[in-house]
Design a protein with these regions (language model features):
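Transmembrane-helix signature of polytopic, membrane-embedded enzymes
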Residues: 15, 103-126, 141
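Membrane-interface alpha helices of multi-pass inner-membrane proteins
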Residues: 21, 124-128, 162-178, 187, ...
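Juxtamembrane membrane-water interface segments that cap and precede transmembrane helices
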Residues: 66-78, 234-266
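Transmembrane-helix motifs of polytopic, lipid-linked glycan transferases
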Residues: 90-110
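Specific aromatic-rich, kink-prone transmembrane helix
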Residues: 102, 124-127, 139-157, 188-196, ...
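C-terminal luminal/periplasmic domains and tails of membrane-associated envelope-modifying transferases
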Residues: 366-429, 434-657
Length: 657
């Protein structure tokens, strides 16, 4: 470890790094896991007990299920109780700023060169920024930093206080995030195996087998003090395996990040672990050739091999390649002789400074420019605690205000938010834990295909009594519900449908009438179920279009319509029409889309929206007139759009007969 004096440029550079960390970490909440964690935390706070069943489920609330994040959930519930959702953003920012401050400090002492420590921390920001979400896994980098000196240095492991530090880390980690706390045991297990290899294979008298065994035993004991660890890991494993098999992006190999595009941050996440693996192996070959068996450190080999396997295994783990990289950087810095140290350190410092600046720029492009679309949009969005188009804010608010009851077949990303606001009046079919039985998985997967969703809604209602559905529009491909289903509420692309034979159907329709009457709909007591849905959708459209993000989108679209460039005008008209289509203002959307098609009759996407809008607004002949052009232009449509048009054509044909 090297202690360096603090200098003003260093303070300024670290301040920039931590300011960016604070900015990214305080972004509007977008983790789909957050709200079921929060709801479980509220249950723990109110009952004083950790839930042992999947009590939020509409299907199997008595099914055994233990979540291993109970302490994080309880703490976040306390934060929200006293400071609201804004408090979660602030707390997240403080935790991650502290994490990166500790990371820089640890690297500064390990490497002995400020600029190397700064560049290393900047790389960690790029690799870990995707985990800047309000969920327990955001803490893993902090625990990684706390264990970094322990894994890098034999001297640290030999200190008298180290077992106590390991015990504290193990207890805290296992109760905050039991699943990832296993990494501590795996790491210390690798150290113990390495020490045994040093004694048995390399015949080294200084092999600290007993010390390594003590640290591992302390870590295991600390983890087992969690009341949820073993059951939590068992239940998590039964839930995560089907997720992996179904292609959950978080659990795909790191290289699959390139599916999202060849942007700098994606390239680093996708190829960074492989680049570090190549650099580490090359460096080890060089060192062993130069020094022979004396250079072999089996402890380090096992640690780095394990971390590199995990880093390659899943996108979410890419940052774990930082451990082998830390060994490489530290060894390079330590190898320089006193005579060449000044020259080499100056050169390395200059390269590291340029690399750090580039990495910070990459992180800013990814988190702000790409994440929000522009600085102007970032400012607009940042004022809200919830990221736009992430949670069913409008429909959940309606369901709570109206007092609607019943089980919900829902978009899997919405389950947590719906549970937070509506449980126990409403249970959900699924949330992001995916605690599903084998019989539920096909319904869940196929209900997220808009073309198969109506059949899955019918199957879920028949099998599990889920009388409500909550999905992104269009719930039904042609915008008209199947027989038996009635629209309760729509706001933008959020839709709630009620089955007419549901256990709470009559009560929910009565609640909708009262809700509409309270908002000035004079004849709410006499409207038909379909007319009730239309009235509710009209209110929802006004509220949704008044939201900041929609106002910004419409303003940008109308600005494009004033352009001298025809293609830009067409794009602006299509964007405005699509936004009005989302809002459910089909007649108005049709008029806007028709104006764009006058300029470019070959705009297949606009014509697809126009056909759906005409059909939904009752103009079947107008919709039918679009089918020949759409058939000719179908190669320009997405598979889902082609499927919608095929179903629309069948509906039109059935109507003609």
């Amino acid at each position: 470890m090297t202690r360096l004096p603090v200098r003003a440029p260093e303070v300024a550079a670290v301040a920039v790094l931590l300011a960016l960390v604070a900015l990214y970490a305080a972004s509007p909440l977008f983790a789909v896991d957050l709200f079921w964690h929060l709801k479980l935390g509220e249950v723990i706070r109110d009952t004083g007990a950790i839930p042992r069943t999947d009590l939020l489920s509409a299907v199997h609330p008595d099914r055994p299920y233990v979540q291993f994040n109970w302490l994080w959930e309880w703490l976040v519930a306390l934060v929200v109780e006293h400071f609201g959702l804004r408090g979660v953003r602030v707390a997240q920012s403080l935790v991650l700023v502290g994490t990166f401050a500790l990371l820089y400090r640890a690297c500064r002492r390990a490497f002995g060169i400020r600029t190397l420590a700064f560049a290393f921390s900047a790389l960690a920001l790029v690799l870990f920024e995707d985990r800047f979400q309000a969920r327990p896994s955001a803490l893993v980098l902090g625990f990684f930093v706390l264990t970094l000196p322990l894994l890098l240095d034999v001297e640290t492991r030999a200190r008298r206080a180290t077992p106590w530090a390991v015990a504290a880390i193990a207890v805290a980690w296992s109760n905050l995030h039991g699943g990832e706390s296993v990494l501590l045991v795996l790491s210390l297990g690798a150290v113990l195996a390495g020490e045994i290899a040093h004694r048995v294979w390399l015949r080294r008298a200084d092999a600290a087998v007993g010390r390594a065994g003590l640290l591992l035993a302390v870590a295991v004991a600390g983890l087992l003090l969690s009341p949820t660890l073993l059951d939590g890991i068992r239940h998590w494993w039964t839930a995560v395996v089907p997720q992996i098999e179904s292609g959950n992006e978080e659990w795909l190999p790191s290289y699959t990040m390139l599916r999202n595009g060849w942007r700098p941050a994606f390239i680093l996440i996708a190829l960074g672990p492989t680049a570090v693996a190549i650099a580490y192996v090359a460096e080890q070959v060089r060192v062993v050739r130069a020094r022979g068996r004396d250079a072999i450190d089996v402890r380090e080999w096992l640690l780095c091999a394990g971390y590199l396997v995990l880093a390659h295994h899943a996108v979410r783990n890419a940052f774990l390649c930082l451990l082998p990289l830390a060994f490489v950087v530290r060894r390079r810095a330590q190898m320089w002789s006193a005579a060449e140290a000044a020259v080499r350190r100056r050169g390395a410092g200059q390269v590291a400074s340029v690399a750090a600046a580039l990495l910070l720029a990459i992180s800013f492009e990814d988190a702000v420019l790409h994440g929000y679309g522009s600085l102007e949009r970032a400012r607009t969005i940042f004022a809200s605690d919830l990221a736009p188009a992430t949670y069913p804010e409008f429909t959940a608010r309606f369901l709570r205000e109206a007092g609607v009851e019943g089980g919900i077949l829902n978009d899997g990303r919405w389950g947590g938010y719906l549970s937070w606001l509506l449980w126990p009046r409403c249970g959900t079919f699924v949330d992001s834990r995916h605690d599903l039985t084998p019989e539920m998985w096909p319904i869940f997967l196929r209900s997220h295909d808009p073309l198969q969703r109506p059949q899955m809604m019918a199957r879920a209602f028949a099998g599990y009594g889920t009388e409500l559905s909550a999905f992104r529009a269009p719930t039904f491909p042609t915008l008209r519900p199947d027989p038996g289903w009635h629209l309760l509420f729509k706001a933008g692309d959020e839709e709630i449908f009620q089955h007419e034979r549901g256990a709470h159907a009559a009560a929910n329709v009565a609640r909708l009438r009262r809700w509409l009457a309270a908002r000035g709909v004079a004849d709410a007591g006499t409207l038909s179920p379909d007319a009730l849905g239309e009235a509710a959708a009209g209110i929802g459209a006004r509220v949704w279009l008044a939201a900041p993000m929609q106002r910004l989108k419409l303003r940008d679209a109308r600005r494009e319509q004033a352009s001298a460039d025809a293609a830009t005008r067409v794009h602006g008209l299509r964007e405005e029409g699509a936004t009005l289509w989302q809002a459910g203002l089909y007649a108005e959307a049709a008029r806007v889309l028709a104006r764009g098609l006058v300029i470019d009759p070959e705009d297949a996407k606009a014509r697809h929206f126009l056909a759906l809008c005409l059909f939904a607004s009752g103009d079947a002949d107008g919709a039918r007139a679009q089918i020949p052009s759409l058939t000719r232009l179908q190669a320009r449509l997405t598979p889902v759009q082609r499927g919608r048009i095929a179903q629309l054509a069948r509906a039109l044909d059935a109507g003609a007969r």
